[in-house]
Amino acid sequence: MTETESQKQIKLEICIDNLESAENAVAGGADRLEVCSALQLGGLTPSVGFVSILSYKYPDIPLYCMIRQRAGDFVYNEDEMAANMEDVEWLKKAGATGFVFGALTSAGSLDRTSCQSIIETARPHPVTFHRAIDVAYDWKTCLEDAIDVGFKAVLTSGQEPSALDGVYIIREMQELHKGKIDVLAGCGVNSSNVANLVEWTKCHWYHASASVAKKNAPLNKVSMGKQDNQPSRVTSLEEVRMLKATLAPV
């Protein structure tokens, strides 16, 4: 007997970019980790060493690795795509079980060639189309193309600054393509709003950082960059637990 839509378990993906965050996310009950570096830049490709350690420490937790060479737009040239595909190959060997990627053309449509290259390189692992869809010119066509080229999921805030603002488009994505692709509602998701997001979007996956500020140790007066003046952010064990507790009875 198959599950009905209302009976499906609602799951939580936590994005992390450091080992402390990974430990807290797993201890809090995260169903999956989106593994990145530099979340303050929207998430970039993680190192092979980082993924290797996570795979060793948490063999039962799915690890979906961000593939994004640089910050900025999602229009990649040939050399950048070669580097992206090389990263996929090495991260597969390190223990990645899935990938997160998105590429657009300069006109704002899904770059089929680049996306197909990543999907083929990632096989047999699934690939999620990330929030590039939120800056696509036409999200409906972009989502149809994502399904057509073989993405298994899409991460979105509904083309708004937060998932809470984008609930109507997220709900429409879910209704239009139910059963064809998993829609992950993400950006600004927390324990105080996730119940409303479940009610309004009907998604079965939610994506959050569940992070809190952590003051950096003042080792010296020499700055390594602008981010030195900002507190780092670490996934909160309690916030992950509260998210899971809120999702469990829904």
Swiss-Prot record:
GO terms, biological process: copper ion homeostasis; egg-laying behavior; IRE1-mediated unfolded protein response; multicellular organism growth; multicellular organismal reproductive process; response to copper ion; vulval development
Gene3D superfamilies: Copper homeostasis (CutC) domain (3.20.20.380)
A Pfam family hit: CutC
Keyword list, A-Z: Copper
Molecular function in Gene Ontology: copper ion binding
Signal peptide: none
Phenotype seen when the gene is deleted: Reduced copper tolerance, which results in reduced brood size and retarded body length, protruding vulva (pvl) phenotype.
Cellular component annotations (GO), alphabetically ordered: cell junction; cytoplasm; cytosol; nucleus; striated muscle dense body
Known role: Involved in copper homeostasis. Affects body morphology and length, egg laying and brood size.
PANTHER family reported in the protein's UniProt record: COPPER HOMEOSTASIS PROTEIN CUTC (PTHR12598), COPPER HOMEOSTASIS PROTEIN CUTC HOMOLOG (PTHR12598:SF0)
Family, per entry: Belongs to the CutC family.
Name of the molecule in the record: Copper homeostasis protein cutC homolog
Species this protein is from: Caenorhabditis elegans
